[in-house]
Amino acid sequence: MAGFPGKEAGPPGGWRKCQEDESPENERHENFYAEIDDFAPSVLTPTGSDSGAGEEDDDGLYQVPTHWPPLMAPTGLSGERVPCRTQAAVTSNTGNSPGSRHTSCPFTLPRGAQPPAPAHQKPTAPTPKPRSRECGPSKTPDPFSWFRKTSCTEGGADSTSRSFMYQKGFEEGLAGLGLDDKSDCESEDESNFRRPSSHSALKQKNGGKGKPSGLFEHLAAHGREFSKLSKHAAQLKRLSGSVMNVLNLDDAQDTRQAKAQRKESTRVPIVTHLTNHVPVIKPACSLFLEGAPGVGKTTMLNHLKAVFGDLTIVVPEPMRYWTHVYENAIKAMHKNVTRARHGREDTSAEVLACQMKFTTPFRVLASRKRSLLVTESGARSVAPLDCWILHDRHLLSASVVFPLMLLRSQLLSYSDFIQVLATFTADPGDTIVWMKLNVEENMRRLKKRGRKHESGLDAGYLKSVNDAYHAVYCAWLLTQYFAPEDIVKVCAGLTTITTVCHQSHTPIIRSGVAEKLYKNSIFSVLKEVIQPFRADAVLLEVCLAFTRTLAYLQFVLVDLSEFQDDLPGCWTEIYMQALKNPAIRSQFFDWAGLSKVISDFERGNRD
């Protein structure tokens, strides 16, 4: 094929040859026809009498239009494209005779092309034509239809037509790339706009001398590579889906509720804990409501939260952690209690696992709350305008009260009881509000609440829980009168509580009262537990740590039988006891930080 610049024979009529100069205009023309060269046939038979003798005449391909840019050919009302560069078109556009050498063009121009104007006329901008009604409101004209096989192309839709050859080669190249002419995922109109234009890349690869055969080779070579990659990607996708299906062992995760929860934007609690905030220091008194199931602790907390608003922080019972995180510990515990499988090691192991899970939220929250305590400000007596931190249960119930009840019921062994007891911790300022209620009324409220896992509980269970609270309360009274070391000596059998009373220089209570408290307290049970190994230092240290920690607490007793459906009256009793007891003190907390921590616990409990 002859090179583009340097053609000697000038074209007739409105056509002119391209001069070899460095002008920007000719450079632009050169770039344009270099791009056309990518799609033009390698051999073009010249027509007419102006073809040079003895040389390959490609003037029909390399003629430069007088005006720039070449415009798109108009279309008919039916959307069909009119023939481009036919004998009539060349005659009307360039003024050439039918015998002119420029009677045809091997390619069709895109939509909107117009014939070049004569040399003496100034180029004018094309006038946009309104879209034809036949196209429809949802159909868009195909901008690449000039690259397709059409019935308007010279030569018809046969295998010898150059336009048909280009279209066929392009479709083969797309098939090599894994792209069909009409994808299953898109409509025909959408597929027209997704056809890649590869002539620029082909031009750069061939040094500006792209050929049709190079286009097909380029598409075929890369098509094989892309088809392999797409095949491998599809295999990996199917494999990953199979692995995920195998790992998805819990069918409950695919329920509608689980999917809705995954879509919701949730905040990770530890992020809010570490977020910087402006500390707001406030004095607050910590109260922990305790009692048997169904006495009305949650009802009281909801009432106080509605009354005091921002002056209170209510910490709910971590029921969701106990029932929805891993196994349901509440259900497992009541199952062991109702089956009455006493004195078995496997039952004790299951009960121990449940009790250790019950203690976890209380220990975590106590540690977090301790970090927000302003120790520099110290503690003070409770004032009327102080804030309140109200908890639904203390660690005391999970690590001391209920394990003691299970030990007496022979559902927990001595060894497992010591393990749970060793987890008990408390801070100075923690006040236990023991809400007492007679068994009959308590049973009525428990049935009214109607929790499924509590349906097997009876009056005997509630009585044993109340007895366990009473034993812990009697032990706490002893810690207020005697030193922890003396109490441990009594538990180890080194002395008696009566001897300790007589040896005291200033006896506070009589020995008979002390002996009665000791027999009804948890210390009498501890003496029985550690008696076989009373010389073991670990057991003695567990007892000593428990006695010292128990002395940190303060107790407030409320008999709910006197306040039947009287929540304000019940709170008044609690409030007055807190004001009158000088040992119950308020501490200073970072109120803003504590509010964020508790809000995260409440959010997790609601979900």
UniProtKB/Swiss-Prot annotation:
Report which gene this protein is encoded by. Answer: TK
**What organism is the protein native to?**
Epstein-Barr virus (strain AG876)
Question: According to its UniProt record, which residues of this chain constitute the active site?
Answer: 317 (proton acceptor)
Where in or outside the cell is it found?
Virion tegument; Host nucleus
Q: Which UniProt keywords apply?
A: ATP-binding, DNA synthesis, Early protein, Host nucleus, Kinase, Nucleotide-binding, Transferase, Virion, Virion tegument
Q: Which GO terms describe its biological process?
A: DNA biosynthetic process; TMP biosynthetic process
Spell out the reaction equation it catalyses: thymidine + ATP = dTMP + ADP + H(+)
State the protein's name: Thymidine kinase
Additional information: Phosphorylates and thereby activates certain drugs like acyclovir (ACV), valacyclovir, and famciclovir to a toxic form, that leads to successful suppression of the infection, while the uninfected cell does not have this ability because it lacks TK.
- Record note on quaternary structure: Homodimer.
Q: What is its EC number?
A: 2.7.1.21
Q: Where is the composition biased (Basic and acidic residues)?
A: 17-32
- Name the positions where ATP binds: 291-298, 445
Region Disordered: start-end pairs: 1-160, 180-215
